[in-house]
From Swiss-Prot:
Species assigned in the record: Pyricularia oryzae (strain 70-15 / ATCC MYA-4617 / FGSC 8958)
The protein's name in its UniProt record: Developmental and secondary metabolism regulator veA
Compositionally biased residues, Basic residues: 217-229
Stretches the record annotates as PEST: 457-506
Motif (Nuclear localization signal): 38-43
Length: 594
């Protein structure tokens, strides 16, 4: 084996050896350190040495090339075609060895100073030239000082003809092991303490070229310098300018204001009964109607004896005192789609009024109020019966209207009125199907409101007769009223209108007697609707004058007073006040007979 050296400028010269195989091939091995280590930081030998350590910078790179030929000048490069395995082992040694003093005992070996990965396999790369390369990106030194690296090349042959020539004397060494081929040393480099370490520099172009071809090399594109307060930085002007820029960026980040959070979305719908400024908007989408909702309504149950047969929809979800909302359908009250979300008072609703909100589309826009004339009230009362209801498809209404037996419940603090107090409005006249279907056309809600004079004339010309309200009759033998009359609602006006029924004026002829029945209707559309009935019943006046002591039974007057008060407020576009239902009934006991 013959070794030769070539001149190298940046470090020690490359090393080349020559050998002859068993098959007669002459091979030349040339190894060179193409990237020399320059500096590193001492990592120490404590428990934190493995976690906080800096590798040798830049990482050492060793190049290997293999040639075949009779002479090196005529040799051919066979690095990629030669069938063998190579690896390089690195060791650390001091650049200036120190002589041992005179000691009597044996020399104690120092602990290892090199740490990291000292072994590297050969990588076949095309750049910078086609050759085999050994990289050491993870080498660290424990103590500060000046050192150099020593690289030893080992080879494992694959073919028997590529093995070394057999020696003249047989050896007892086992077959099939690695052969040590050559050794090369790196240039000297310094290891600094943590306080004096200048920092890691940028990655070299050779390291970037290696990383681009898939090797595991750490790439640093910024300078990592240690900045000391009050001292000029050793990194130059670029590091100082970068530090100033970083300080300015940090100050700008601190001056920035925090991005305001978006306002919270109002997921909950505001109730229209608690506020007067609630906007009219469509309700949230409800559930899809089930198959049971599309079924035709069942036939109505037969009413109890002595009561009129009146059916009302039972699908409304608003209840008053346990009774379904709109269970007593006699007077019609137009509502909008927003009424489905209104809060309901705990006071039970008056039996003389009901809402047809269940007959409107659930997502329909609010409609303007419509005055409820006697003809409309009568039609609405009859339209609640299932026989007069037209068959409606599921596309017209979100929920079907199913009939159920009507229940009547009373609050414990209310008094049930007697039958004669309401009997003057219980008679009903025949109604044609055309009047019941008129209320289901949207154009009916947009009709112009007639003047009050037309209403009075209509009231005097045709007085409707309504069916009796289903109230249990008390055990009081009171005479029936002399006449039956029906009040009429007036259109909305800024100022309240007060008048008395002209029918009574015609009957009385301008005279008012205390024992005749009379009605007082006071209407206030600005904020509420008040309906008062006062009836005074007494015996029919006879031709003979009453006794002086007034002891005769027919001279004793029996008076019965029923007062009904209802306050109805609509949404903002109709009335400014919130929704309230007030139902008051009072009954005065007749005076005791002497």
């Amino acid at each position: 084996m013959k070794a030769s050296t070539d001149h190298h400028v940046s470090g020690p010269p490359p090393v080349m050896i020559e050998r002859v195989t068993r098959g007669g091939r002459r091979l030349f091995y040339r190894i060179d350190v193409i990237q020399q280590p320059e500096k590193c930081r001492a990592c120490g030998s404590g428990p934190k040495s493995s976690t906080d350590r800096r590798p040798v910078d830049p990482p050492p790179v060793v190049e290997l090339r293999i040639f075949e030929g009779p002479r090196f000048e005529e040799a051919k490069d066979i690095t990629f075609t030669y069938n063998a395995n190579f690896f390089l082992f690195a060791t650390l040694e001091k650049a200036r060895p120190m002589a041992h003093g005179r000691v009597t005992g044996p020399v104690v070996d120092a602990p290892p100073v090199l740490t990291g990965m000292p072994v590297s396999g050969m990588a076949y790369l095309d750049r910078p030239i086609e050759a085999g390369y050994f990289l050491f990106p993870d080498l660290s030194v424990r103590h500060e000082g000046t050192y150099r690296l020593s690289f030893n090349l080992y080879e494992e042959t694959k073919d028997d003809r590529d093995k070394d020539m057999e020696p003249d004397e047989p050896s007892s060494e086992p077959q099939g092991f690695f052969y040590h081929r050559m050794e090369i040393k790196s240039a000297d480099f310094a290891c600094f303490s943590a306080k004096k370490f200048p920092g890691l520099g940028l990655s070299t172009p050779l390291s970037m070229t290696m990383a681009e071809q898939g090797t595991r090399v750490r790439i640093r594109r910024d300078v990592r310098m240690r900045r000391r307060d009050g001292k000029p930085s050793s990194g130059g002007g670029d590091f100082s300018s970068n530090s100033n820029n970083n300080a300015e960026d940090e100050a700008a980040r601190r001056r920035r204001t925090r991005t305001p959070e978006p306002p919270a979305r109002e997921d909950l719908r505001r109730s229209l009964s608690g506020t007067g400024d609630a906007p009219a908007r469509n309700p949230e989408p409800q559930r899809r109607p089930s198959a049971a909702d599309y079924r035709a309504p069942p036939p109505p149950n037969p009413p109890p004896p002595g009561f009129p047969s009146a059916q009302v929809p039972a699908t409304s979800h608003l209840t008053f005192g346990g009774a379904p909302y709109g269970s007593h359908s006699q007077y019609q009250q137009p509502t909008s789609s927003s009424s489905s979300s209104e809060q309901v008072s705990s006071v039970p609703q008056s039996p003389a009024y009901s809402s047809h909100a269940a007959q409107q589309h659930y997502g329909q826009a609010p409609q303007p109020p419509t005055p409820t004339y006697p003809e409309r009230r009568l039609s609405d009362h009859r339209s609640s019966q299932p026989n007069n209801h037209p068959q409606q498809s599921p596309h017209q209404h979100s929920y079907s209207h199913r009939s159920s037996p009507q229940r009547e419940r009373f609050m414990p603090d209310s008094r049930r009125p007697s039958a004669p107090s309401h009997s003057h409005i219980l008679s009903a006249r025949p109604m044609t199907p055309q009047s019941a279907n008129e209320l289901r056309r949207p154009s009916d809600y947009n009709r112009p409101i007639p003047p009050p004079t037309d209403v009075l004339v209509a009231d005097t010309q045709a007085t409707p007769h309504l069916p009796p309200i289903r109230w249990p009759r008390p055990n009081m033998n009171l005479p029936s009223p002399p006449s039956e009359h029906q009040e009429a609602l007036q259109p909305l006006q800024p100022a309240p209108l007060h008048y008395e029924s002209q029918t009574h004026q015609q009957q009385l002829g301008g005279r008012k007697r205390t024992h005749d029945s009379y009605e007082e209707h006071s209407y206030s559309y600005g904020y509420s609707y008040s309906h008062n009935h006062s009836h005074g019943y007494g015996p029919t006046p006879s031709a003979r004058p009453p006794a002086k002591n007034r002891k005769r039974p027919e001279d004793v007057e029996e008076k019965y007073t029923v007062t009904e008060t209802m306050v109805v407020d609509r949404p903002e576009q109709f009335f400014p006040k919130p929704l309230k239902y007030v139902w008051t009934q009072c009954r005065a006991e007749p005076p005791p007979r002497e």
